Amino acid sequence: VPEDVTVIVSRLMSIFTNAPYDEIYNDACEFYSELAQGGFISYSDEYVEWSRDSYFSYANNALVELPKVETDDFAYDDVFGEIQQLTRVQVDVSGYCNEKCVHCYIPQSCKHGLMSIDLFTRILEQCRDNNVLNITISGGEPMINPDLTEFLNLCGKNNFSVNLLSNLTLLSDEILRVLVANPLISVQTSLYSMNEDIHDSITGLQGSFKKTIQAIRLLHRHNIPIQINCPIMKQNKDDYSDVITWAQSMNIEADSDYMLFGCYDCSKKNLKCRLSLSEVEAVVTSQCESGAYVDKLFTEASNK
């Protein structure tokens, strides 16, 4: 929701009581201009009636050219001093999951329990006291928790940006309304293949492909920022790139990775699907032969 900078400055005046108004105002304008240049906020000299379409739109979405920073020009201690700033906290609000992904690092015996509103509220209070900026809500599957919409609303009331990690198979109209109403919420999901049988064989849930695809299209229609992850494993190594191509056709951010890790009970039972060294070599070789992949690497390198 848009807010006039003078209103923000008035609140800052009650904190920085010894600083003159003009100094705080100029510093605030400079700070918000830098955030706007980085794509973190929308900032204008004129009042604009907010709508999600004007804040973020897949039709108008384009890569933001961030200013190049040389390593020698930036040192963490020079900027933040000796105080180590915590900026992001991940909160797993559900131990349960309706999928049984073959590569999941959470042992099946550990998939239980739901977080209460009281505990979530106390976590947010501590995050606010420590100037945390982003809350990542995950699980298990967070949409199994019946209090998810309340969690999201609490994050909104406390001005946290939110990254919601979900398989999206349980997306409801109630949850969708909350996502649409808050421009600070983005969604991250996994799509393993454009082949329904392959995707469902990985998730262990029949019909999960159709539900996830349908939910992605619905979020896309409402201009809710989505990121698609596509882990590469034995089951999808020959067609994972179709997921990336499909996502790019809709201007959705997507990425793939062949790194899989064992369960956190130190077992390796989920690693049967991990690529062998020769399969990793084949995947990397194929990617390097792709002009689009090489262009992406050059772009990422130039922005570092």
Regions found by a protein language model. Give the residues of each.
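Alpha-helix N-cap/loop-to-helix initiation residues
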Residues: 17, 144-145, 172, 208, ...
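Hydrophobic positions in alpha-helices of CheY-like receiver
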Residues: 12, 127, 151, 155, ...
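Long, charge-rich, low-complexity alpha-helical segments
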Residues: 1-87
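Flexible, glycine- and charge-enriched loops at secondary-structure boundaries
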Residues: 21, 110-117, 205-209
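Conserved alpha-helical substructure of the radical SAM core
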Residues: 34, 40, 59-186
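Radical SAM enzyme [4Fe-4S]-AdoMet core and its adjacent flexible, acidic
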Residues: 190-192, 197-304
